[in-house]
């Protein structure tokens, strides 16, 4: 650095206010001299060295485009001082490095430096967030410190960001790399000055027990609860929190809904002109009590029902935000809420305080087996509940845990070859859109077992208008927003290869579009998928459509698909097994209902 050039590093402010504009000349590592500016929502910089930015030197290589570059405060997770050291000249391609080495070496200088840490979206995968660091150098230490103070002040104003987190790590999740995943991302939390209390689970149900027993006073000292594991581990933590706190009326039992059902034998969609049996909302819509105090059938920590509220674990309107760092076998929840199955991306969503709300499904088991007495038992699911094929796969997979995630492919093939079907009865509350959709189904002349109907699909994305249309969960009480005044229940009975209820699309590596491509994260609906008994080739075609991007897995005659807020299930076999977010759930009779926007989550939704 030559003497007499200190004026190039002067900083000047357009406003005395901390929120006002601020500009100054700095050297950006590997770029060159830039004019750095701070405005109300972020940083921007513009190259000042024409020899670097115009691309007229070093054989015409453009080192830095002559345009402004920026990063928003909402995308910055840390600013740190990195002491006195080298600020490098612009990066060069290998072909030209030798020719320009001597010239660029002269421009490499030592100065005081600070680094702005943020992220950049991958050009090919916008949902994938890559760590990015921008190091700025200046000859004056006080100037660097002043800029750091200003930037940190701006970050403090990002009020949604967590400062203290309770982290559960499942060391054996997925391929058994839960601890390694946390070790990788924990460095980002440390750099962002986020305090973490880490609990590495030692047994099944460990996280559930901690969440069920922790006092709300202690829970409120944390800004969020983080799971490092898979969907099943997230389910365990969620149930530990909700079962001891959430008090809402239960959904109708199968016998209750039968009294108000419009029965049509094996057809669950009424034809145009049919008489519609409507019921009053107070009778059959379970989530609209007359008052906050009018609740029924509460449950204890173990899921059984009682009528006594636990005073040590009331359900707070200020619910903790949950987060999930993927380390599981499928990681469908992360795929649906961030768009990427990437621990670093999920960690950044958490640190930067991204927020959305997820629907949750309350599942009530009335009977375990056909000979059991009626005894309500409650669980919650954040993504999926499945019976038949799905239940058989999760049940059989327990024998092959030593295989890791590959066990699902192996067991799935075995169950497919067995081609078992189950006799059952399903009743569901019909959504308003079902009435018009029912009259539109027509048969394809070329493929008699496929439907020709193609409806416009509105996919769930970041800042989704459908999910943000209204908040489903009333933060002032444990009630939901008003629902339609009248509801209609329909019944379908027969033999099924599988029955699935999806809360979200459930995208994963085996089903890139998910079970229902246009399912939303917080629209207040369950997506009921009934696969009726059919030949093995037809079922294989359905699974093939499910496994490819742009497929139509629901467009078959033997597939019934309904959007609903609640449904009931009764098996005609001796026993039945359900898959609840990847966990085994035995239920001969069950009911389920959606709770809109119940779960606050550190995520922003997929970008594309």
Swiss-Prot record:
Keywords: ATP-binding, Calcium, Kinase, Metal-binding, Nucleotide-binding, Transferase. Residues 255-269 have a biased composition (Polar residues). The keyword Calcium applies. It catalyses: an N-acylsphing-4-enine + ATP = an N-acylsphing-4-enine 1-phosphate + ADP + H(+). Changing residue 412 to R: In acd5; reduces activity 10-fold. GO terms for cellular component: membrane. Pfam families: DAGK_cat (PF00781). Disruption phenotype: Enhanced apoptotic-like cell death late in development. SUPFAM superfamilies: NAD kinase/diacylglycerol kinase-like (SSF111331). Substrate binds at residues 229-232. PANTHER family: CERAMIDE KINASE (PTHR12358:SF6), SPHINGOSINE KINASE (PTHR12358). This is Ceramide kinase. It comes from Arabidopsis thaliana. The gene is CERK.
């Amino acid at each position: 650095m030559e003497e007499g050039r200190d004026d190039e590093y002067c900083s000047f402010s357009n406003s005395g206010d901390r929120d006002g504009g601020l500009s100054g000349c700095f050297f950006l590592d590997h770029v060159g001299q830039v004019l750095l500016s701070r405005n109300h929502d972020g940083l921007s910089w513009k190259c000042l060295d024409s020899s670097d930015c115009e691309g007229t030197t070093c054989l015409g290589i453009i080192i830095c485009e002559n345009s402004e570059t920026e990063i928003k405060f909402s995308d910055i997770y840390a600013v740190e001082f990195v002491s006195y050291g080298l600020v490098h000249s612009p990066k060069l391609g290998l072909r030209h490095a030798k020719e320009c080495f001597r010239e660029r070496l002269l421009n490499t200088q030592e100065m005081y430096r600070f680094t702005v840490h943020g992220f950049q979206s991958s050009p090919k995968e916008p949902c994938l967030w890559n760590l990015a660091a921008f190091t700025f150098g200046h000859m004056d230490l006080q100037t660097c410190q002043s800029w750091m103070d200003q930037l940190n002040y701006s970050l403090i104003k990002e009020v949604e960001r967590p400062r203290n987190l309770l982290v559960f790590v499942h060391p054996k999740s997925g391929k058994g790399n839960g601890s390694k995943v946390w070790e990788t991302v924990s460095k980002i939390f440390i750099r962002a000055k986020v305090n973490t209390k880490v609990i590495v689970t030692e047994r099944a149900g460990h996280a559930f027990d901690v969440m069920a027993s922790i006092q709300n006073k202690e829970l409120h000292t944390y800004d969020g609860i983080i799971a490092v594991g898979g969907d099943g581990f997230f389910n365990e933590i969620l149930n530990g929190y909700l079962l001891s706190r959430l008090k809402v009326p239960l959904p109708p039992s199968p016998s209750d809904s039968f009294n108000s059902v419009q029965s049509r034998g094996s057809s669950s969609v009424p034809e145009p002109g049919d008489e519609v049996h409507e019921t009053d909302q107070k009778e059959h819509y379970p989530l609209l009590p007359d008052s906050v105090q009018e609740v029924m059938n509460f449950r204890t920590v173990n899921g059984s029902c009682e009528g006594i509220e636990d005073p040590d674990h009331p359900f707070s309107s200020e619910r903790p935000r949950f987060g999930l760092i993927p380390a599981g076998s499928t990681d469908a929840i992360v795929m649906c809420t961030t768009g990427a199955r990437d621990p670093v991306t999920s960690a950044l969503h958490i640190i930067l305080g991204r927020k959305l709300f997820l629907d949750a499904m309350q599942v009530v088991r009335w009977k375990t087996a056909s000979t059991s007495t009626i005894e309500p038992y409650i669980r919650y699911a954040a993504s999926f509940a499945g019976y038949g094929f799905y239940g058989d796969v999760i049940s059989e997979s327990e024998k092959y845990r030593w295989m890791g995630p590959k066990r699902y492919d192996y067991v799935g093939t075995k169950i497919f070859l067995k081609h078992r079907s189950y006799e059952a009865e399903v009743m569901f509350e019909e959504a308003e859109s079902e009435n018009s959709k029912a009259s539109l189904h027509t048969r394809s002349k070329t493929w008699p077992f496929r439907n020709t109907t193609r409806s416009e699909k509105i996919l769930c994305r970041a800042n989704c208008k459908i999910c943000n249309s209204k908040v489903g969960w009333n933060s002032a009480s444990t009630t939901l927003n008003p629902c339609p005044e009248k509801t209609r229940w329909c019944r379908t009975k027969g033999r099924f290869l599988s029955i699935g209820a999806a809360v979200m699309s459930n995208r994963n590596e085996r089903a890139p579009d998910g079970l229902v491509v246009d399912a939303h994260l917080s629209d207040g609906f369950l997506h009921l998928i009934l696969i009726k008994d059919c030949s093995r080739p037809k079922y294989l075609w359905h699974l093939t459509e499910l496994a490819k991007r742009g497929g139509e897995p629901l467009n078959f005659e033997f597939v019934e698909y309904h959007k609903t807020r609640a449904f009931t299930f009764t098996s005609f076999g001796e026993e039945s097994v359900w898959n609840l977010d990847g966990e085994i759930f035995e239920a001969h009779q069950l009911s389920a209902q959606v709770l809109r926007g119940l779960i606050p989550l550190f995520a922003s939704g997929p970008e594309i």
